[in-house]
Amino acid sequence: FFTGANFTVDRFNMANLGGDTTISQWTTPWHGLEAVLDYRNVALGLAVLFLSRMLALHYFMNDIDDTQIRERSRRRSLCTAGTFLVFFLVFLVSLLFAQGWSVDPATGIIAPEPYKYLHNLLAMPYVGIGLLAGVALVLWSIWLGWRGSRKAIWLSGSGTVLTVLALSLIHISE
């Protein structure tokens, strides 16, 4: 999504009745597994892993009426949230300072652009507000979850949706 992939697309193969109808092909023998060598992909994957753990712990605190489970979930949520925040911040900072690709509307030439995603975020203030609101909701839910509140799941879920939506929108801007 943000770091690219080594593959080619040949749409003319769709009309190739007698031969190969494969539209996309990997250009390396790794078939996309080389993406794990980029630290941004690893940071995003681990951030998603620990965010899903945190959401599950918040869900347990909200829906399971057992004081022992609720207390264990509360204790584990703080460590899980801290680990999530480290990996999410690594991903977010590296994304905002990463080089992206832009299209010159006059010539149609695709060229690298430094700080592309930061420029996209600054060009769309509503998306920036959505990103900040989503991050704030997740941070607030971490604090509520640590205090044992049953409402943490609602804030963390809403914050996750806003943050993922904003990250998707800064990718597609021209």
What does each of the following model-derived ranges do?
Residues F1-K151:
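Long, contiguous internal "core" modules enriched in hydrophobic/ aromatic residues
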